[in-house]
Amino acid sequence: MIWRRRAGAELSSLMALWEWIVLSLHCWVLAVAAVSDQHATSPFDWLLSDKGPFHRSQEYTDFVDRSRQGFSTRYKIYREFGRWKVNNLAVERRNFLGSPLPLAPEFFRNIRLLGRRPTLQQITENLIKKYGTHFLLSATLGGEESLTIFVDKRKLSKRSEGSETSTNSSSVTLETLHQLAASYFIDRDSTLRRLHHIQIASTAIKVTETRTGPLGCSNYDNLDSVSSVLVQSPENKIQLQGLQVLLPDYLQERFVQAALSYIACNSEGEFICKDNDCWCHCGPKFPECNCPSMDIQAMEENLLRITETWKAYNSDFEDSDEFKFFMKRLPMNYFLNTSTIMHLWTMDSNFQRRYEQLENSMKQLFLKAHRIVHKLFSLSKRCHKQPLISLPRQRTSTYWLTRIQSFLYCNENGLLGSFSEETHSCTCPNDQVVCTAFLPCTVGDASACLTCAPDNRTRCGTCNTGYMLSQGLCKPEVAESTDHYIGFETDLQDLEMKYLLQKTDRRIEVHAIFISNDMRLNSWFDPSWRKRMLLTLKSNKYKSSLVHMILGLSLQICLTKNSTLEPVLAVYVNPFGGSHSESWFMPVSESSFPDWERTKLDLPLQCYNWTLTLGNKWKTFFETVHIYLRSRIKANGPNSNESIYYEPLEFIDPSRNLGYMKINNIQVFGYSMHFDPEAIRDLILQLDYPYTQGSQDSALLQLLEIRDRVNKLSPPGQRRLDLFSCLLRHRLKLSTSEVVRIQSALQAFNAKLPNTVDYDTTKLCS
């Protein structure tokens, strides 16, 4: 393409050489840009992947080739020459004077031969293949001279490390390359000689020297003295215009369509755009015209290289000093689960930094892989055969924790297996078992070992609280029988007990002492005021080796004839003492608690048996039963089926005689159980003076068993009563501080036991 400067250009000489004005195929991209207003740019990406001046430029091609070869860094030093802009004077004169373009006769003849309705193939053969798709409007002359050094930093660093042990003179560092690049324009020959020597001796760098521009750079001292130059280098800044503007109106649209089909489809199909998507409608001879096989193959090769790099990164991490040092510091005297390894991991700052470095490298690698995969899918979406894409999975910290376990426990006889914490076993290569090492014992809480045995790491040496060592394993401790301390059960079955209670059999009667200052048995008394009575056993004085269980209560109450009085009973039970303040109230007829059963006796007087049956369901400890008797007056209500009760003092006529009442007898039904206070005191002494650690734990377990069984017999309520403290205070005569100390020791020991739930109790005894 021949050009003159604007001052001395001749139009005739430019038009005579019109073939030089129409550019070749690599300038087609601006023709596509001319119709970009009606089509989106993104659908063209797959068509423009390997065409156009940018992708065909030498600098871009060199960069892509070096990147595929593994060179990660580029250093470039360059200098530019003066820039001059030249214009197409023929087009400029047409725009200014409005005169027609003096086109070459051959060009006119080819247009006439096309006719009014040419096919796309005719336009391609007669115009596009001869004259191209664009002509040049303007260009910038000049050029640059540059030196480019591509560097593989990994190979360079390894070479530098290896050279440190040999000679310092042969080492190549980034600083050396910087100095050589800076001296290129000062002493070009010696610099290139040194760089080429390094390139031959090492594969860590690639050196490229370029001198671009239509002037041949330093061949011209002054552009004013140049008569004409040839503009044909794709590196220059050029302004193009589509050839269709030179054609008649009836040919312009068909020319654009033919040009797009020629450039985008290589004349193998017709270029079509629809619904923001463009593709080639392939001809019968080229069914794969939409499938850029070379690009797809290059991307598949890139993915393979990424997989190899991924393996290299992981291998470098395992071979790093930080990884090896971390493995050496891991304790070997007990089994390490993933949680323990993770805790040790967080304590090693050097290992953490090395893993973060691996993570960052992997993120960059996978981002690159995802971009390639996305582009690969876009390129192959119209291929008949889809590419096979296989990428390795990202290795999370969980993978590395399991990997570390595999190095510890599945790395015998030169074979590395895979460890599973769930099954506590190894999976060895080729289904062998020779890679499995002896697993040390598991140290932890509950049934895990406290320490491993020093002579055999696979077995427990000591156990946690509440567990005992048995054949190298820790098993839950079971409290020994507490029957020789205190009894809880009777030999009678439930049905037998129920029958004896119904019959008020004297064989289950507990003989208690009746005490009352308000009345006497078998004596009539005025029931207008509340009467208090109690039945007590005085076990500390008479029956110190027994505790007692109440199953029922029976009273025989008689009234004078025609009396309208109704007895009302309130019962309080003290489990191990005698005072009323440490007694609990029986919730008679509340919720599911039993009610009094009244049975009339065949006697001349109004006598009734009042019986309260607790049975095995509601049985509880008792030492003293407090009974409070008061009376109420029964009267008919407004309706005949209703009864109204009055307090005696509320009656209209206080002077009226309401009758008398007497209690013939009171019986307590239940049974007595064995109780050894001295043995329990000895058990408590072991908390302060244990013979061995095992004896103290055994004593605590037995006391816990006694405490829970005693408190389980507390009366119904939202919270259990603390009957065990009452037992310690009244039957063992312990001080309040001693009781608090024992309860605290039991609570602390119970918290260490497995699968135990402590419960809150209500204080009963002070």
Curated annotation (Swiss-Prot):
Key words, A-Z? Cell cycle, Glycoprotein, Growth arrest, Mitochondrion, Secreted, Signal
What start and end residues bound the annotated signal peptide?
1-33
GO cellular component terms attached to this protein's record: dendrite; extracellular region; mitochondrion; neuronal cell body
Q: Does the keyword Transmembrane helix apply?
A: no
Explain the purpose of this protein: Inhibits neuronal cell proliferation by negative regulation of the cell cycle transition. Promotes pituitary gonadotrope cell proliferation, migration and invasion, when overexpressed. May play a role in cell pituitary tumor development.
Q: Which residues are glycosylated?
A: N168, N337, N456, N562, N609, N641
Tissue expression as described in the entry: Expressed in the brain. Weakly expressed in embryonic stem (ES) cells. Expressed in ES-derived neural stem cells (NSCs) and neuronal cells.
Cited SMART domains:
MACPF
Q: Which PANTHER family match?
A: BMP_RETINOIC ACID-INDUCIBLE NEURAL-SPECIFIC PROTEIN 3 (PTHR15564:SF2), MACPF DOMAIN-CONTAINING PROTEIN (PTHR15564)
Localization recorded for this chain is:
Secreted; Mitochondrion
Q: What is its main location?
A: secreted
Pfam families, per database record: BRINP (PF19052), EGF_BRNP1-3 (PF25415), MACPF (PF01823)
Q: What is one GO biological process annotated to this record?
A: cellular response to retinoic acid
Q: Which organism is it from?
A: Mus musculus (Mouse)
The residues forming a coiled coil are: none
Sequence ranges assigned to domain MACPF in this UniProt record: 74-264
Q: Which family does it belong to?
A: Belongs to the BRINP family.
Q: What is this protein called?
A: BMP/retinoic acid-inducible neural-specific protein 3
Induction data: Up-regulated upon differentiation into neuronal cells in the presence of retinoic acid and BDNF. Down-regulated upon differentiation into astroglial cells. Down-regulated in gonadotrope cells by bone morphogenetic protein and retinoic acid.
